Amino acid sequence: MRLGVNIDHIATVREARKTYEPDPVKGAIIARDAGADQITFHLREDRRHIQDSDVEKLRAVITEIPLNMEMAATEEMKQIAIRIKPDRVTIVPEKREEITTEGGLDVVSMTDYLREFIKELKDNGINVATFVDPVEEQIKASMEVGADAVEIHTGEYANARSDKERDNEIFRIKKAAVYGRSLGLKVFAGHGLTYTNVQPVAEIEEIEELNIGHSIIANAIFLGLDEAVRKMKKLINEVRRKDIRV
């Protein structure tokens, strides 16, 4: 199983003072060298953390492992992606007032628009995933609009308050992952995953990649980023020994 390390919150700390450090690009290099299988970042429309200059630098230095750009389905972001050429674009919903992404993309309501949007990205050599809730209707629509993969939103699982709720959410995620694979899609997962809740998701064999950011960066304050990445990789590998490549 691959681990994508999201570096957004390194930039969040930097932007708290509108200064030059910590540098998310340096963080990406450390994460890569610690065993990250992918670097993920979200260039938001409001530029609250990652900046355009970061994106340019990330593309220049992250060449040995995939670079995954999370973005809203806007014309501005599409043109940036076509110019930068990340290895993958993950299309996410975005609201300016939200603290973090609050749910999955409603692909069903945007099929005509997304079909053309995704085609242009793929015509420029970029793989495309949609970030969706564990709902078969959204996964099927993702396949129909031409996505190569779905990333299943694990936020409801992460926010579950009881063992029963967590078990129910794991069942939903597992069912969605099986369905996605049956349609020929690659299946990833992420959002709200931590050192204490990651393993039940990592055990789902249909999921081949997890994207994790906040928990790793939060622990890096105390452990250092290198050790924080290695610790997460170790937890995943304890339940998933199979190494799946793009």
UniProtKB/Swiss-Prot annotation:
Sites binding 1-deoxy-D-xylulose 5-phosphate sit at: D8, H9, R44, H49, T100
Which domain of life, per UniProt? Bacteria
Annotated GO biological process: pyridoxine biosynthetic process
Keyword Ligase found: no
User: Which InterPro entries does UniProt cross-reference here?
Assistant: Aldolase_TIM, PyrdxlP_synth_PdxJ, Pyridoxine-5'_phos_synth
Q: In which pathway does it act?
A: Cofactor biosynthesis; pyridoxine 5'-phosphate biosynthesis; pyridoxine 5'-phosphate from D-erythrose 4-phosphate: step 5/5
Q: Name one GO molecular function term.
A: pyridoxine 5'-phosphate synthase activity
Q: Which UniProt keywords apply?
A: Cytoplasm, Pyridoxine biosynthesis, Transferase
- Active-site residues, Swiss-Prot/TrEMBL: H42, E70, H191
From the Swiss-Prot or TrEMBL record, state where the protein is found: Cytoplasm
Is Cytoplasm included in the keywords of this UniProt record? yes
Family statement drawn from the similarity comment of this UniProt entry: Belongs to the PNP synthase family.
Q: What does this protein do?
A: Catalyzes the complicated ring closure reaction between the two acyclic compounds 1-deoxy-D-xylulose-5-phosphate (DXP) and 3-amino-2-oxopropyl phosphate (1-amino-acetone-3-phosphate or AAP) to form pyridoxine 5'-phosphate (PNP) and inorganic phosphate.
Which PANTHER family does the entry link to? PYRIDOXINE 5'-PHOSPHATE SYNTHASE (PTHR30456:SF0)
Protein name per its UniProtKB record: Pyridoxine 5'-phosphate synthase
This chain's source organism reads: Persephonella marina (strain DSM 14350 / EX-H1)
